[in-house]
Amino acid sequence: MAWRGWAQRGWGCGQAWAASVGGRSCEELTAALTPPRLLGRRFNFFIQQKCGFRKAPRKVEPRRSDTGTSGEAYKRSALIPPVEETVFYPSPYPIRSLIKPLFFTVGFTGCAFGSAAIWQYESLKSRVQSYFDGIKADWLDSIRPQKEGDFRKEINKWWNNLSDGQRTVTGIIAANVLVFCLWRVPSLQRTMIRYFTSNPASKVLCSPMLLSTFSHFSLFHMAANMYVLWSFSSSIVNILGQEQFMAVYLSAGVISNFVSYVGKVATGRYGPSLGASGAIMTVLAAVCTKIPEGRLAIIFLPMFTFTAGNALKAIIAMDTAGMILGWKFFDHAAHLGGALFGIWYVTYGHELIWKNREPLVKIWHEIRTNGPKKGGGSK
């Protein structure tokens, strides 16, 4: 669930200001100068007020080093990213702001699937060598004294008992936990807002489309997303395979953020978003499309079960209604974009993209076998 950022901030005043405006009280001056606050879930932009009096010259204050803001600036709910220190201004040409994200989405998706195809080739090649290495290792283990109660042995046992899907998403979960910890560092707040929240009104448009997929400010938000990803990990990896799943997941994060950009530009509701929900919606939609008769249940209400197909229809209907009615708590455009991409990929995309990877794999095989061609003239 990609969260919208919001903040509210007022202006203070001093005795010198009250004297310069004809004896108006500090409270009256504050009310007159206070810009529109950022209310609700929508990130509204500050509008500069025009005043009918001359303002006293401002004292030049020494520039503070960017070592973070005061603790008061971030005393807020754990669900709300501290965005009051960063103001985003919408482009006067909003459609143009989508050109770079569009090219980035297409280019990144192509690179993701190309890298996954090469990764699969290398994995298959290494399995043959690993097979013989495994035989040798088993023989050495049989004659080597075994350590009982060794912590490393217990970790290896736990890891070996995981499914391929669970092993794959363990790395994704670790990355999300790392980014969550970075949000807790005050000196990194500006960097996190700039690069780990996606917003078409920001100066940085492309890299946040990927990085925000691993970004969660709320512990509950991250825990809920990672639980859903863990629950569907075995099914999706059994359907797609490890390498193809990673390409789909990363591409889904970028594609869902691009759909979010389009929705924000179309409605004018700008605001930073973050979270893995767009990519997770792709995983959920792909599994529910492939296994529509599978039974699902809610974590705290296991007595109520429903089919995967019905669950997918309900989620799409809710996100569509959220977009039309302007619900602001979730980024419904990102959710809907991720779900539609998941449905499209398992229905058509696998045939169009993954099964046509052979030319790229052959080129890579020739490079690995013969090495790069040497230039120059004849010997």
Curated annotation (Swiss-Prot):
Catalytic activity reported: Cleaves type-1 transmembrane domains using a catalytic dyad composed of serine and histidine that are contributed by different transmembrane domains
Function: Required for the control of apoptosis during postnatal growth. Essential for proteolytic processing of an antiapoptotic form of OPA1 which prevents the release of mitochondrial cytochrome c in response to intrinsic apoptotic signals. Required for the maturation of PINK1 into its 52kDa mature form after its cleavage by mitochondrial-processing peptidase (MPP). Promotes cleavage of serine/threonine-protein phosphatase PGAM5 in damaged mitochondria in response to loss of mitochondrial membrane potential.
Transit peptide: 1-52
Alphabetized Gene3D superfamilies for the sequence: Rhomboid-like (1.20.1540.10)
EC number: 3.4.21.105
GO cellular component annotations of the record: mitochondrial inner membrane; nucleus
Enzyme class: hydrolase
Origin species: Pongo abelii
GO biological processes: protein processing; signal peptide processing
Sequence ranges on the Mitochondrial intermembrane membrane side: 122-167, 231-244, 293-295, 355-379
Subunit and partners: Interacts with PSEN1 and PSEN2. Binds OPA1.
Protein name: Presenilin-associated rhomboid-like protein, mitochondrial
Family affiliation: Belongs to the peptidase S54 family.
Pfam families on file: Rhomboid (PF01694)
GO MF, one example: serine-type endopeptidase activity
Alphabetical list of InterPro entries matching this protein: Peptidase_S54_rhomboid_dom, Rhomboid-like_sf, Rhomboid_protease_S54
S-S bridge residues: none
Active-site residues (renumbered): S277 (nucleophile), H335
Membrane-spanning ranges: 102-121, 168-187, 208-230, 245-262, 274-292, 296-318, 333-354
